[in-house]
Amino acid sequence: DWERREGPDAIPDQIRFERRWGEVRRYANDRGIRILGDLPLYVAADGVDRHAHPAFFRTDAVAGVPPDYFSEDGQLWGNPLYDWKAHKAEGYAWWVERVKAAFRLYDILRVGHFRGFAGYWRLPAKAKTPETGRWVKGPGPDFFKTLLKAVANPIIAEDLGDITPDVTALRDQFKL
């Protein structure tokens, strides 16, 4: 239970933080400094997004990456994967709101694990190692056509990991 774990002061603390952050951001912006924020592709398995919007997440698979120059064995992250068909059916509204919320905090947004929008490493939910995964096509251009109609702020694509021509093409198509 969130309230019991975080305590009765957690919500006022969050409000105070948001107000103070707004002051810091305005101070920086007034001096020509833009704030760069980070938006990870995946959410936490035990996070509020997954619990508040279960239809947008798969329960049979989790995220990771295959062996690459960062890890010779690959990585089993364990984050829930998105049900991209469900997101598309809703016009990617959850994503649009997620990105808009990030832009209430930041001026520029770096999207982590960008390559997952072109293709991502899908592992069975009960996987013990990353070798059991496989590449699955991501939402690609359809997602960014919708997102960028709603959000005009600058987005930077993280380019770490196994960057294949389809990832580069997606990044370049939308000038990210």
Language-model regions, residue ranges each:
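Alpha-amylase-like alpha-glycosidases and glucanotransferases acting on alpha-linked glucans and related
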Residues: 1-20, 42-176
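Conserved, well-ordered alpha-helix/loop/beta-strand core segments that scaffold catalytic motifs
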Residues: 17-42
